[in-house]
């Protein structure tokens, strides 16, 4: 090509131009370019918007001369939204005038003025003229709608619009930053994930290796965004993509936060599905999440489901069969029913010898029996555990607590005898429990003797037992009882006795086992 394209419309006027073009055609094209420059300069000299429209219309409807102007020539950086709307109203029937250049310039005005109505009109005119929005026009329209929180407009703009991966990535990146900073637009983020991200995922085979990696990173960033916002619909929308194998690598932070969001909002079914996925893929699960699952079942008054969950998962974590965890379920069971026999029947599938949850279920029943002060239930479960050589210090302290509830020194002595072969540290706790029961039953002489005997065995009384005994003797004992108690403690070297007695509350509670 040997002519210099000095006009922005030169190439448009020379469509089909080739080296074989006749000289007359070349001359005609150059004349059109000169005419376009002349008319454009004339249009730019007009300051009044109405006069500009008149000039443009006169050139448009002049059939005797070729029309060289473009609708975008009417737009300057000073064009207002009402003026642009007037242009659209006047030329709305002429789809051929809506070029990409016009849409780009108009979208800048819409974005600058945050006019969602104008942005939606531009999108509609582009669709009517069958024009795919350029990156500039699309981004301007999209951010205008986003900043004005026009959810429907955003979704309509996305649907049917071919969007390159780089543009989509930029949209999500900026949206994620905007959402995290402002704490808003989480629903718009959800709508875009449901439409645009799904579209990217369905077309991932066409992406390069780096783009696939970026898509995976984007997935986990979206998951984190929804999780930190506790926006459950978003979490539940994204997780199935992980389950069906769309992404091979695991982002533990995103998964943990998702699990926390589901558990915190009581979405037990979705949380359980995620736990099963982690278990099947040999991914370690934090004990805290399993405990939260149990807590949720108990709060929902579904203790049987909590037991079933523990049975299925206790091999994953010893915490599920621990006394602390079983105590939660026991409290839920005792709230649901006052009939221990009915609860025992309910727990029968778990407490039979062939059950994998056999021993933990009897620990559970023992706790329920303790709460209901059912001696036969406690003794039966204790016998089962003893037969299996599964007695721990927790069970002995439960028995001691039951002795305290019954105010039975004989029961406490029997429990103490059972503990003869336990560790010294565990036995010292039980001895203190026994002393507390003696004081509770006003058997002060025996209590003093036991205290001195335990001290001779290098077992020092705890702060709790000192406070408890002082409180009881002060309230129910004689002056002599109080004198002997103080002397016993001083003989044991309790230097802070006066301070403890001075700060003694009106009533001190002692428990062998807290429930």
UniProtKB/Swiss-Prot annotation:
It comes from the Eukaryota. One of its GO terms (cellular component) is mitochondrial matrix. One of its GO terms (biological process) is mitochondrial translational initiation. GO terms for molecular function: protein-macromolecule adaptor activity; protein-RNA adaptor activity; translation activator activity. This is Uncharacterized protein C106.19. It comes from Schizosaccharomyces pombe (strain 972 / ATCC 24843) (Fission yeast).
């Amino acid at each position: 090509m040997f002519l210099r394209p000095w006009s922005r419309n030169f190439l448009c006027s020379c469509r089909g131009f080739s080296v074989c073009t006749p000289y007359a055609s070349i001359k005609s094209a150059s004349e059109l370019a000169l005419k376009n420059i002349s008319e454009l300069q004339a249009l730019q000299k007009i300051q009044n918007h109405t006069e500009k429209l008149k000039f443009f219309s006169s050139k448009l409807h002049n059939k005797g001369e070729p029309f060289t102007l473009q609708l975008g020539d009417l737009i300057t950086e000073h064009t207002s939204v009402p003026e642009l709307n007037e242009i659209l109203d006047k030329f709305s029937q002429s789809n051929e005038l809506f070029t990409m250049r016009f849409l780009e310039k108009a979208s800048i005005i819409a974005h600058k003025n945050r006019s969602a109505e104008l942005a939606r009109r531009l999108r509609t005119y582009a669709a009517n003229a069958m024009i795919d929005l350029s990156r500039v026009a699309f981004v301007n329209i999209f951010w205008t709608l986003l900043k004005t929180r026009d959810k429907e407009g955003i979704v309509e703009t996305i649907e049917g619009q071919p969007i390159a991966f780089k543009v989509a990535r930029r949209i999500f990146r900026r949206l994620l930053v905007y959402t995290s900073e402002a704490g808003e637009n989480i629903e718009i983020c959800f709508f875009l994930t449901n439409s645009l991200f799904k579209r990217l995922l369905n077309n991932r085979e066409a992406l390069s290796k780096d783009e696939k990696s970026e898509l995976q990173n984007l997935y986990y960033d979206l998951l984190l965004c929804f999780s930190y916002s506790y926006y459950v619909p978003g979490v539940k929308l994204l997780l199935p993509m992980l389950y069906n194998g769309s992404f091979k690598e695991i982002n533990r932070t995103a998964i943990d936060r998702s699990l926390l969001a589901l558990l915190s909002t009581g979405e037990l079914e979705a949380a359980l599905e995620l736990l099963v996925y982690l278990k099947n893929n040999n991914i370690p699960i934090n004990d805290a999440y399993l405990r939260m699952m149990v807590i949720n079942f108990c709060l929902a008054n579904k203790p049987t489901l909590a037991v079933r969950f523990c049975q299925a998962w206790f091999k994953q974590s010893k915490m599920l069969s621990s006394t602390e965890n079983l105590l939660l379920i026991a409290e839920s069971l005792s709230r649901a029913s006052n009939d221990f026999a009915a609860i025992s029947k309910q727990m029968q599938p778990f407490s039979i010898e062939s059950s994998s949850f056999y021993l933990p279920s009897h620990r559970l029943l023992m706790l329920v029996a303790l709460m209901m002060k059912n001696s036969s239930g406690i003794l039966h479960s204790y016998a089962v555990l003893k037969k299996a050589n599964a007695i721990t210090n927790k069970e002995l302290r439960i028995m001691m607590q039951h002795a305290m509830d019954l105010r039975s020194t004989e029961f406490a002595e029997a429990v103490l005898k059972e503990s003869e072969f336990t560790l010294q540290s565990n036995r010292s706790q039980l001895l203190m429990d026994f002393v507390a029961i003696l004081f509770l039953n006003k058997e002060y002489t025996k209590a003093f003797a036991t205290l001195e005997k335990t001290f001779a065995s290098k077992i020092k009384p705890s702060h709790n037992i000192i406070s408890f005994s002082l409180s009881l003797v002060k309230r129910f004992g004689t002056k002599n009882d109080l004198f002997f108690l103080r002397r016993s403690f001083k003989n044991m070297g309790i230097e802070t006795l006066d301070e403890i007695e001075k700060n003694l509350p009106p009533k001190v509670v002692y428990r062998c086992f807290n429930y």
